[in-house]
Amino acid sequence: MSKKITLLGSTGSIGTQSLDVIRAQGYEVYGLSAHSHVEKLLQQVEEFHPKYVCMTDLDAAAKLDAALAGRANAPKLLTGPEGLKELAALDGPDVVLNSVVGIAGLGASLCAIESGHDLALANKESLVTGGHLVTQAVEKHGVQLLPVDSEHSAIFQCLQDKESAKSLTKILLTASGGPFFGMKTEELRGKTKADALKHPNWNMGAKITIDSATLMNKGLELIEAVWLFGLPPEKIQIVVQRQSIVHSAVQYSDNSIIAQLGVPDMRIPIQYALTYPARVPGVVPELDFTTLKLLTFDVADEETFRCLAACKKAIKKGGLGPCAANGANEEAVKLFLEDKIGFLDIGRLVEAVVDSDSFGGDYTLADVYECDKMARAFVRAHL
């Protein structure tokens, strides 16, 4: 069955891997968006012929507009953050895949849902910062929320037996452990961005690779899992699986465990989200069990990797706590990538923001953006 896809964040790591899947399945691309990568987006326009494109950076949008001028069948250009939301809301696609990085993806997720589109969600920050708003909107508009993160896709796949899903008692959320697994605080003190960007298993963008090194990514995924699957955080166990073969598992009331395994390739969860509920042949090689000599499982070190501990505190506080943790982390990672703070400062700053307020209670979309600004300002004031 052919589908039309709007892909938000098409020039990033998840975006380009999504286009691999779309190409292999012969799906039609309805819309594409990028932040500032003009040349890459132009290449995608040449191949996939979308009806709409969006460039959120206005300087880059002007360059894209000039490059598209005079082209036959050029897509309509939308610009800025409002253009991204407009693209997400347009009638036409069967699925909107949101792979925008950071809180910038929240508004687009809500617009897609409120317009009645099924949402394939790689932008975990939508649920981390606005989980209450997103899940309410999904219920109100009767759309599918399809997880693209490999771990949440694995859990989603393990829960497809709806009767068994009623007996879910625990989620086993796996983590690779990142490049610094097993190291203690003193060993981490001098780690640079070059060290942190060397992920052992996954091909990802810079921000999520740093998040993997600090274990912030796993903290965000814990929060995401609470919203997606309805279990409290104490029922979600983080397990370090160094080989990234077991992508996550679920435990039922009879203590049986069902896991999803596969090679560490993001195109598997991307494809499942786009073809759901069907399973079809894809572009990823099969897992050869005879080559697996060892699968290891370890406890995540929250004492050393404070981002994970901070995220657990944040989700237990509720309300805007996770939003504050996310905003602090986005700002701290930006500063780390600019060589303005050290690796350990990321966890210190995220935890300090979470500890600075109670954060409880209901919230609006405006509250989310205000909390995000507050968290970023806190980080800059406490360097």
Per-range role (PLM):
Residues M1-L383:
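Catalytic, metal-anchored helix/loop core of enzyme active sites in primary metabolism
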